[in-house]
Amino acid sequence: MHPLAMPAAMAAVAAHEQGKFWEYHDKLFANQPRFQPDQLLQYAREVGLDVNRFKAALDGGRGRPSINADMAETNALGVTGTPAFFINGRFLSGARPFNDFAQMINAELQRLNIPLPPAAAAQGGR
């Protein structure tokens, strides 16, 4: 796990508690390659969070139990990074071209004897 993953996840949970998860998420991802833990409060200010509530949530570790549960579940499923996808229980790891998804979905439809959509059938299941 990336060393900043837990602080970033806890900050996102703290932002969610104030109804600004997506704003905070977008700020984190816009600065992902270079952000530092001390910038988490700065980002909270920038997206309009109550910084005292935000800091209290971080200091109290309120998000940690749910984050740890999510991490345990992903580890049990064999997920080692992002992005990760499951299509009808089949694991697909990493950023993939659309065709990889289409092939897996069509293979699952065929395995379950579900007719392919007309466009997929016309392309031979691709």
Give the residues covered by each predicted segment.
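C-terminal cap of thioredoxin/glutaredoxin-like
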Residues: Q39-R126
